[in-house]
C-alpha cells in the first residue's frame, strides 16, 4: 500500500519546519545500525488516527525572480504535484501578504485538497486575527501554534479526512511488482525501454493505484511482471531532475508499491553518495533489491574489471550485502537476460518461509559456534526463534533481556540464518523480544 504524501508549503518564516518536526516527532532520529545510508532528507513518516503518511517540508516561496527563489519555487511546484494533500501555512502575526496570495494561486492550479493552517496563534486573543485568511478561498482556517503544539490535532484531523481510500492491488499474487530507481541520468528510462523491447510481451498499460501513475504489465520466460509507474520513470525535465530531494517523492511511491526494486548505477561515473541515498530508500522499506550497473559498454575492460567493480559496489553498499549485482547496457541491449534470474530469486526469497524446527536448529548451532555475549556479568539467553512475517522475512528471537542483544550479535545470527536458508536479494529482519 502507498502512504499518502502531505506537503507543507508557504512563504518563508511561517513555521513550516516547526510543524514538520511536531508531526514526525522522533521518527527523524538516525538509526546507527545501518552503515552507508545518508539521512539528510526533507521528508519523514507521520501517523495520525491510525493513518500513516509521508510528510515533506518545502522551502519558503517568495515573490521575485532571483535564481535562488526560482529554484525554490520550482521545488515547491514539484512537491505540490506529488502531494496528495497540502498544508498551506500562513503567519497570523504578519497578516495576509502578497506572497501568501501568490502561493494560493499555485495551489488553485494544482486542484489538490488544501488545508489552510494559520500559525503562531499563541493565545485566544490572536484567534480574532485569522478571519482575514478566509479571502484565500480554502475554507475554514485552522489556528495553530507550532511552538506550543496547540491546534495540531484539529489540523491533522482535516488532513487525514482528505486521504483517499487505497485501491486493492489489481495484480495477481504471482505477478512480480518491479520498480526501477536511481539518481538522474543513470539510464532508468533506457532500461525501461530495453526491458519492454524485443522478446518481451507487453500485456497492457493500466492505471496504477497511485494518482496518475501508469504501470506496465509484461511477461518474460513464463513469468508475469508489472513495472510500477513507467510514466514517472520516463518523466523528463531539467528542473525536475535537478531537484533530487523532491523528485524522489515519486520514486518513494513506486518503491512502496513494489516487491523488487532495481537500483541503477552508472558504470561510467562510478558510485557517488546520491546512489547510496537512493538505494537507502528501498532498503529502509524492506524491499527485495537487485543492483544494476548500467552503461557497462562504456567501460574499458580486462579480465579483472568486473571483479574490481563488484568489490567497489560491495564496499560502497555495505548495507546491501544481500543484493545481487547485474552488469548491463540498456542502450546496447547487452546482458539484459542476466537480470531476470536475479529478480525472480529476490522475489522468491522475499516471500520465503522456513520451518520453526529447522530455524531453531540453525540458531542453536550458531550459538554453539559463537556463544551469546555477556554484559556486567549477565549473559544473553536465547530461548526460541520464530518467523513472524514475509516481505521481508522477519524473525522474532525470544531472549531474557533485549538490551543484551547487541547489534553485532544480531547481525551474526542474521548471517547464520542467511547461510542456512539463502535469502539472496532480500533483507531479513531480526527482532529481539523479551520472553514473558
Swiss-Prot record:
One of the GO BP terms on file: ribosome biogenesis
Pfam families: KH_dom-like, MMR_HSR1
Record keywords: GTP-binding, Nucleotide-binding, Repeat, Ribosome biogenesis
Residues reported in the UniProt entry to bind GTP 1: 10-17, 57-61, 119-122
Domain KH-like as annotated: residue spans: 352-436
Stored NCBIfam families: GTPase_EngA, small_GTP
Record note on quaternary structure: Associates with the 50S ribosomal subunit.
Function: GTPase that plays an essential role in the late steps of ribosome biogenesis.
Protein name: GTPase Der
Phylogenetic lineage: Bacteria, Bacillati, Bacillota, Bacilli, Bacillales
Gene name tied to this protein: der
